[in-house]
Amino acid sequence: MWGRGLLLTDMNREFPPPRAAYAEAIVKPRLVLPPNAPGMPIGLFGGTFDPPHAAHRAACLLAMRRLGLDRVWWLVTPGNPLKDTKGLAPLASRVVAARKLAHHPRIDVTDLEAQLGTRYTYETVKYLVRRCPQVRFVWIMGADNLRSFHRWQRWRGITKLVPIAVVDRLGPSLYASAGVAGQALAYARVPETAAKTLPERTPPAWIYLHGLKSPLSSTALRAARALQR
C-alpha cells in the first residue's frame, strides 16, 4: 500500500521536460521590429553583407516588385556558419554599410540575429513567424544559395515556415534548380507567372525569379579588398 502510494506520487509528479523542450521554451526578448502589420507581405533577406553591394539591393527591388512585397528586411548576420568568419568586418560596420547602400524607404536593415542570439536561419525565421503570425513573410535568397541550401541547418524546416523566392544570379541559374534542394522541392515550385501569389501561399512553396544577371559577389569583393591591403 505504501509502495503504491509512492508510485502514484511519482507518476503524478511534474518532472522537468527533456533538454530539447527547454530549448523550445526559451522566451526571446521583446525586440522592436521594423514596420509591419497583419497581412503585410514582407521579404526576409539574410547575409553577412561583407561587403554589401549593388546586386543585394537589385535582388530585393526585383523581389519587391515581382512578389508585391510591402517591405524587405535585411538580416545582417554576425557570421555565416558555413563560411570562414576570419577577417569578417565587425557587425556594426556592416550594418552601417548596408544601410548606406540600401537607401530605400521600404528596405529595413537590421541586426536582429545578434539581438536574438540566433545562429541559424531556421531559429530566426521561426521566432519571427511566431512573433508576427499574421505577417506574410517570404525568404529571399540568391540562386547560389539555393545550390547549397541542403547544407543549411534544418533547411527543410525553413521551407515549412515561409515561402521562398530564389533570385537569378549570373552563372548559378544554370545549375541551382538541379541541386539537392531544388530537386527535393520541385513539387512545391510555383510558376513564375504566379509570382504575386507567393506571399499568400502555404509553405512549402518557392519560386525562381529570372531577370537579374549580376556577377557581383561579396566573396570576390572581399578577395579584391584583401589584395589591395
Model-predicted segments: where are they?
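Nucleotidyltransferase catalytic core that binds NTPs
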Residues: 2-229
